[in-house]
Amino acid sequence: MTFLAIDVGNTRLKWALYTHPHRDAPLLAQGAEFLDNIDKLADGAWATLTPPTHMLGCIVAGDAVRRRVEAQMELWDVAPQWVVASAGEAGLTNGYDYPARLGADRWVAMIGAWHHAFSTGPARPLVVVMVGTAVTVDAIDASGKFLGGLILPGHGIMLRALESGTAGLHVPTGEVREFPTNTSDALTSGGTFAIAGAVNCMVQHLRDHCGTEPKCIMAGGAGWKMAPSMSVQFELVDNLIFDGLLEMAARRFID
């Protein structure tokens, strides 16, 4: 029984094929494609894969992209299943006002982070940070309840917004400096410290709410860029979305 996990973000599709849907399942193959190139998957990277028996995916790119992905999956006899956030799954309780409106990527990442944290120690409050096109900073208490979270623009969106709305700011990407002395560094540093400040704020809110020190887990394509600028302790975790999909699939696909 093979399992295909798919993570479709705003710019890229990432996929991973496992021997079976379980946290510790061996990885058979993996890859990534920009969304412009996903129509080549069936004749390219997926053509020689062992056919998956189950698939679970997370998508934020919209229905048109979802249909393109499903068209590529027609080379296999497998039913596409896409995550929609629910009131609770895999040990987490969803505290969103309307649970189904929570982004699937946030929900899956929180499930992955919760089980990752729980596997390395006792349950404790958790802040989950995803750094990508957008940045999300989500809080979970020690019982596994998602309390709420923040959404803010990622580095690229911040810079493009300033460039489009302010004359004279079409400048190269700069470096993060404590005291920037040129416009490029000022823009890059401002965006970086804005994200770091949001994380610090949520850690403090969760600390005050729960009365204990939270653990912070960071993931996402640009997470490593934030590492030098963070003032709170955190763990950088790769493939948090895949971790969450594996946890969910292990409970959904029980043969």
From Swiss-Prot:
UniProt xrefs under InterPro entries: ATPase_NBD (IPR043129), Type_III_PanK (IPR004619)
Active site feature: D105
Reactions catalysed, as given in the entry: (R)-pantothenate + ATP = (R)-4'-phosphopantothenate + ADP + H(+)
CDD domains the record matches: ASKHA_NBD_PanK-III (cd24015)
EC number from the UniProt entry: 2.7.1.33
Keyword flag Nucleotide-binding: yes
Residues that coordinate or bind ATP: D7, V8, G9, N10, T11, R12, L13, K14, T133
GO MF terms held by the record: ATP binding; pantothenate kinase activity
Pathway(s): Cofactor biosynthesis; coenzyme A biosynthesis; CoA from (R)-pantothenate: step 1/5
Main EC class the enzyme belongs to: transferase
Primary location: cytoplasm
Keyword ATP-binding applies: yes
Family: Belongs to the type III pantothenate kinase family.
Biological function: Catalyzes the phosphorylation of pantothenate (Pan), the first step in CoA biosynthesis.
PANTHER family for this protein: TYPE III PANTOTHENATE KINASE
Protein name: Type III pantothenate kinase
Annotated organism of origin: Albidiferax ferrireducens (strain ATCC BAA-621 / DSM 15236 / T118) (Rhodoferax ferrireducens)
Taxonomic placement: Bacteria, Pseudomonadati, Pseudomonadota, Betaproteobacteria, Burkholderiales
